[in-house]
Regions:
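Membrane-helix interface/capping segments
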Residues: 69-73, 102-109
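Hydrophobic alpha-helical segments of integral membrane proteins
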Residues: 14, 58-63, 90-97, 187, ...
Length: 254
């Protein structure tokens, strides 16, 4: 009876984790760690609070559930296997991020140096919360009730994609596909290894690589809408006057 009650409480915590993921935009965290149109970022402490709240809920899940490592896979797993598969799939994530940046911008669009610490914290924190929630709790509970592993992996990937809202109107198609495929591959890694260690490592590397290559945490602008593609960026600074030279005799008179 006590064990059943603890599993039900763990299920309730999982639901709160999914709700928290839905609310990432309000915190300016995860894919939404982006500056506004006027160039201002949300409060660092608001973004940090989302990560800390996620960590707290995952911690509560580990305490409440009778056996989170065996049933939910919320553990590193075999260290060598986790490192090998994590870095292997992480390398694929780096490659696709660079390929997308070269296709979209014609170059690697490195972000300003001062944004790296916050982006790395956001990437690692988001990867841990996501993997513990979707590849750990949700996938583990689906497998625990006897659902076929393939069906369970596909189900958690779709739930994950819905929770990130990357398929909403106006959002990047690239991020939608990356989120869905990433969820499927991370689920597969978790089933194969029996833990989320490899999936977490690959996820964190991929998320940080997308930021480094595109300058975005997860919301690449549509063509013509990046700051360097805007008319304001290409125009002369306010107060400057352009001189139109028609020939070598000097400026034209207008």
């Amino acid at each position: 009876m006590e064990e059943t009650l603890r599993v039900l409480v763990a299920l309730a915590i999982t639901i709160f984790l999914v709700i928290l993921r839905f609310e990432a935009e309000k915190f300016g965290a995860a894919e939404y760690d982006e500056p506004s149109r006027d160039g201002h970022r949300g409060s660092f402490f608001r973004r940090l609070s989302w990560i800390l709240l996620g960590f707290a809920l995952v911690g509560a899940l580990l305490v409440v559930h009778p056996d989170p490592a065996a049933d939910l896979g919320v553990a590193l797993g075999d260290r060598g296997e986790a490192l090998l598969l994590g870095f292997g799939f992480g390398a694929l994530g780096m490659f696709q991020a660079a390929a997308y940046a070269l296709f979209r911008y014609g170059r690697i669009r490195l972000p300003p140096a001062w944004t790296y610490p916050g982006a790395v914290l956001n990437g690692i924190g988001t990867a841990f919360v996501d993997e513990a929630t979707f590849r750990g709790a949700i996938l583990g509970l689906l497998l625990l009730v006897g659902i076929n592993p393939v069906t369970a992996v596909v189900t958690q990937a779709f739930v994950y994609t819905l929770a990130t809202r990357t398929g909403a109107p106006g959002r990047s198609h690239y991020m939608f596909v990356l989120t869905l495929v990433g969820g499927l591959l991370a689920g597969l890694l978790t089933v194969v290894t029996g833990a989320i260690g490899a999936a977490f490592l690959a996820h964190a590397i991929t998320r940080i690589s997308v930021f480094v290559c595109t300058g975005h945490a997860g919301q690449p602008a549509r063509r013509g809408e990046e700051i360097e593609e805007s008319w304001e960026y290409r125009a002369a600074p306010r107060g400057w006057h352009l001189i139109d030279r028609q020939d070598d005799d000097g400026p034209s008179k207008r």
